[in-house]
Amino acid sequence: MAKKILYQDNARRALERGMEIMVEAVSVTLGPKGRNVVLEKTYGSPQIVNDGVTIAKEISLEDHIENTGVSLIRQAAAKTNDVAGDGTTTATVLAYAMVKEGLKNVAAGANPISIKLGMEKATQYLVMQINEFAQPVEDIQSIKQVASISAGNDDVIGALIADALAKVGKEGVISLEEGKGIVTELEITEGMKLEKGFISPYFITDTEKMEVCFENPYILLTDKRITLVQQDLLPILEQITKTKRPLLIIAEDVEKEALATLILNKLRGIVNVVAIRAPGFGELRKLMLQDIAVLTGGTVITQDAGLSLDNIQVNLLGQARRIIVNKDTTTIVGDGLEIENIKARCEQLRKQVNIAETSYEKEKLQDRIAKLSGGIAVIRVGAVTETEMKDKKLRLEDAINATRAAVEEGIVPGGGATLAHLSENLVTWSKTNLKEDELIGALIISRAIVAPLKRIAENAGINGPVVIGKVQEQEFEIGYNAAKNLFGNMYDEGVVDPAKVTRSGLQNATSIASMILTTECIIVDDIEKVK
């Protein structure tokens, strides 16, 4: 296919045009007075969303070069979502502001490589400052504030997530389910999270979230490798097909031929199945499989117990209310029938902790007790319509991720205030430590990082530059509360952001922006020639 090639300023400007279209669509959602975006769906009703990364995924432009700009800035949003789970809109707004400021300087003759170095040094300084100013999250009230802000100023969701974390602990699992009514409820149930994901992506059932989600599945537990299709797999698959229920296989490994058989059955719709490798190694693996068996009411198929896969019956399989498997983890939500067995197993493990000889043994036993007894918080999302349900689930996911991030690295003043204050610190630091084009790079960052506050104010119908000026005159804790249209102490107002979200958004925005500023040439398919 013929190619279209653009150089230097033309190339960078074309990328900027694509970025501008994307950022405008995403940034309307920023802040407490941000608006919604309606997404047309090929199947089903349109989706109304307020989530940056979801909107970013939907945007695809006709112009190939502009679309490249969209793809690049989408990476900043996606990476921030992977690391912190929230702050995607902020990352997008920051990246575009950096590119816009940077292009002016590159066009005026500044060296892009030196600018890139200056931007990276400035970002390192800002990350240190964010970590320094971050306040640890210890009380339920702080957790509630973070969750409420991330869910779009929804105090009910904030209280629900704070309650869930209080019950299952910081490491506990919070799972979302679609409720039957219109009220969103919280339920604590037994369950376990394993640090193992699916063996093959062909098992995925939800392509949007890239995960496998099964309701009411059977669970096959074995410590052996599944290699032979006829002996190991077919007997149990035939029995499962009759029940019309899905199957989770947890085994040491699944060999190529057996894996191909499972995938083929899944793709043909004969049986819904997913396979994961058993967690742990050696003797620990067998013990962890026993723990899962207690949770699910199943039996581990091992040669030690005289059991083999070729004569297995359905009554030896475990059961769960729900399982969620992604590329890294597997969450098993219990059905509530094994509470007494779980308590007995935990008691047995606690006795072993007391007689364990090494600290390693004790640590592993305590880890197993935590996994078994920690439980899972299930939030049943209630809504009037399907469209509202999807929006609520996205907000809840953001809120859960933001809350975890806050517990990890602490909180800073929200509403764009932290970056607006640090902008002035950065100017002082860079003038002392950098020179020439590197200084220009740092000053680009200092001007760009006020963009989120400016956009939050504009979405609230207030003059952005005026708000920035007023905030920068005040102490570090003081910011602009767009929901109430007043200036005040952001910690007291409950407008806080997780430091991890602010940090990762800034780092990813700088990474993408500096790559675009050092671009000298773009090569894309020339669609017009083909026509």
UniProtKB/Swiss-Prot annotation:
Cellular component GO terms held in the UniProt record: chloroplast
Assigned keywords, A-Z: ATP-binding, Chaperone, Chloroplast, Isomerase, Nucleotide-binding, Plastid
Pfam families, A to Z: Cpn60_TCP1
Stored InterPro entries: Chaperonin_Cpn60_CS, Cpn60/GroEL, Cpn60/GroEL/TCP-1, GroEL-like_apical_dom_sf, GROEL-like_equatorial_sf, TCP-1-like_intermed_sf
Enzyme class: isomerase
GO process terms (BP): protein folding; protein refolding
Residue sites binding ATP per the record: T29, L30, G31, P32, D86, G87, T88, T89, T90, G415, N481, A482, A483, D497
S-S bridge residues: none
Subunit structure: Forms a cylinder of 14 subunits composed of two heptameric rings stacked back-to-back. Interacts with the co-chaperonin GroES.
Name this polypeptide is given: Chaperonin GroEL, chloroplastic
